[in-house]
Curated annotation (Swiss-Prot):
It comes from Zea mays (Maize). One of its GO terms (cellular component) is chloroplast ribosome. GO terms for biological process: maturation of SSU-rRNA from tricistronic rRNA transcript (SSU-rRNA, 5.8S rRNA, LSU-rRNA); ribosome assembly; translation. Pfam families: Ribosomal_S8e. Gene3D superfamilies: 3.10.290.70. Residues 146-169 have a biased composition (Basic and acidic residues). This is Small ribosomal subunit protein eS8. The keyword Ribonucleoprotein applies. Residues 1-41, 128-169 are annotated as: Disordered.
Length: 221
């Protein structure tokens, strides 16, 4: 039969008279959803649409460009997991990438950028006093080596950048785990990409609460 977007085949709820029947038209066609899956075997299909235009239907993806708004930086990174979807839990269970889905992305590219831009290694776990003593000598040598690598100009530049540096504690916490919460803002089934932005501020707090509540429910069940 095929998916049709016309209303001719629908019954009237009021029991009113049907229109005169005619065959389906090409411009009334519908296509099944892409249901883009999270998979390393990247698959994108070319679809010819009305007017000779082209859409890119992503069937499997695992990477995307994600922007960190407050730092005005964008990096290509791996999508690790789909954790929340406001419209449908089934899309989380089946790891489906759709617009506005909340995903976890790899923090490594952003961590690397932060280190080169500010000279600060974020997300490092604090060690116990015993471990500190053992590693103190090795760290001193490493620190000395790092200092010798940087010129005065670079050091001055980093110090100036550090003056205005602010970092959301929630984001810093996520850097420790190596996974950042992000939102997909592109439409993978239409443009063939799963791009988005890192969650920050009130939006991040909102979704963290949602995930915490979801985790609590599953623990009770």
């Amino acid at each position: 039969m095929g998916i049709s977007r016309d209303s001719m085949h629908k019954r009237r709820a009021t029991g009113g008279k049907q229109k005169a029947w005619r065959k389906k038209r090409k411009y009334e066609l519908g296509r099944q959803p892409a249901n883009t899956k999270l998979s390393s075997n990247k698959t994108v299909r070319r679809v010819r649409v009305r007017g000779g235009n082209v859409k890119w239907r992503a069937l499997r993806l695992d990477t995307g460009n994600y922007s960190w708004g407050s730092e005005a930086v964008t990096r290509k990174t791996r999508i690790l997991d789909v954790v929340y979807n406001a419209s449908n839990n089934e899309l989380v269970r089946t790891q489906t990438l759709v617009k506005s889905a909340i995903v976890q992305v790899d923090a490594a590219p952003f961590k690397q950028w932060y280190l080169t831009h500010y000279g600060v290694d974020i997300g490092r776990k604090k060690k116990t006093p015993a471990a500190k003593k053992d590693n103190a000598e090795g760290q001193e040598v490493e620190a000395a080596a790092e200092e010798t690598k940087k010129s005065n100009h670079v050091t001055r530049k980093l110090e100036k950048r550090k003056e205005g540096r602010t970092l959301d504690p929630h984001i810093e916490e996520q850097f420790g785990s190596g996974r950042l919460l992000a939102c997909i803002s592109s439409r993978p089934g239409q443009c063939g990409r799963a791009d988005g932005y890192i969650l920050e501020g009130k939006e991040l707090e909102f979704y963290m609460k949602k995930l915490q509540r979801k985790k609590g429910k599953s623990a009770v069940a």
